[in-house]
Amino acid sequence: MPIKVQNDLPAKKILEEENIFMMDEKRAMHQDIRPLKIAILNLMPLKEDTEVQLLRSLSNTPLQVDITFLTTDTYVGKNTATSHLEQFYLTHEDVKNRRFDGLIITGAPVEQMEFEEVAYWNELKKIMEWSKTHVTSTLHLCWGAQAGLYYHYGIKKYPLPDKMFGIFEHKLLNRKEPLVRGFDDVFLAPHSRHTETSREEILQNSDLTILAESEEAGVLIVMGGDGKHIFVMGHPEYDRITLDNEYKRDVNKGLEIQLPKNYYPSDDSMQRPNLSWRAHANALYTNWLNYYVYQVTPYEL
C-alpha cells in the first residue's frame, strides 16, 4: 500500500529502507483515486518508534492511505521533541470538523492510573465521542482498547498480580468474521501491560464479540457491533526489539521486571529475539482497512 505522509517525516526514510512504498505528497496529488484518510492518535511516549511500527503495519494492501498524526493538547510528553510534534502532529481541535475513514488510538503508559486520573482523559473522551459521527471505524490498541471499552461500554480494567509481558499463544474463536480472515487457529501476539479487562464483563454485552483470546494472556481481539469500534488488547504493531527495549530499560532503572515470556531464545536476553507475530499483525491491519474501512466508508466523506 502506498502510505502518504509528509515528505520530511523521519519514519519515511526508515520504512523506505525496508522497501515499503512511501508516497510523497506531490506524487499522491497526481493519482486519480481517493486515498483512505486515517488518523492516528499517538499516545505512546516514544512517538517516532510508534509511527514506524504503525505505518509498517498499514503498508500491506494496494490502497492508498493518507495519514494524519494526532496528539493531545492537554498533555505534552517529555520523550518526543516539541519541534517534531509541531511539524508532524495536529490536535483534535485542528480536525474536529473533518471526517476520517479510520482512526487508530494507541496504547499509553498510564494503565495503572484510573481513567479519570489521566491528564488528557477529558480530551480523549471528546475524541471518542467525535469518532462516533466522524470516523467510519476506530481501532483501539492496548490501553486505548481498555479506554474505549470503558468509555463506550462501561467495562472496567483490573490490576494484574504481575505484568503481562511477552509473546503469547492465542486461539481464534470466530473464523467467519472478516477481521480475522487468513488467521491460523492458533497464533502469537505481544502483550505488555499491568491490567486486564474481564472476559465475563465483555460477554455480558450483546454488542461485543470476542474474536481471539489466550489462556494465559486473556482476551486479545473484541469487536463492537458491525466493526465501528474494534479493540485489541495487545501490541500487534510491535517490532522485533520493542519488548527487548522495554525490558532492558526497566533493568537499567533498577526496576523489578521479569523476562518477557516466550521471547528470547532459551530465555537468554543476550540473544536476538525471534519475530513470530508479524504475519498475523499484518493480516489484522489489512483486514481492518479492507473490510471495515474501505468497503464501508462513503466515497465522499
Swiss-Prot record:
Main location (coarse class): cytoplasm
Q: Which GO terms describe its biological process?
A: L-methionine biosynthetic process from homoserine via O-succinyl-L-homoserine and cystathionine
> Superkingdom of the source?
Bacteria
Entry keyword set: Acyltransferase, Amino-acid biosynthesis, Cytoplasm, Methionine biosynthesis, Transferase
Its family remark reads: Belongs to the MetA family.
Can you say what this protein is called?
A: Homoserine O-acetyltransferase
Where does the record place the site Important for substrate specificity?
A: S192
Q: State the encoding gene.
A: metAA
Q: Does the keyword Transferase apply?
A: yes
Q: Which reaction is the catalytic activity of this chain?
A: L-homoserine + acetyl-CoA = O-acetyl-L-homoserine + CoA
Q: Which Gene3D superfamilies match?
A: 3.40.50.880
User: Where is the signal peptide, in residue numbers?
Assistant: none
> What InterPro entries does this protein's entry cite?
Class_I_gatase-like, HST_MetA, MetA_family
Instruction: Name its species.
Output: Lachnoclostridium phytofermentans (strain ATCC 700394 / DSM 18823 / ISDg)
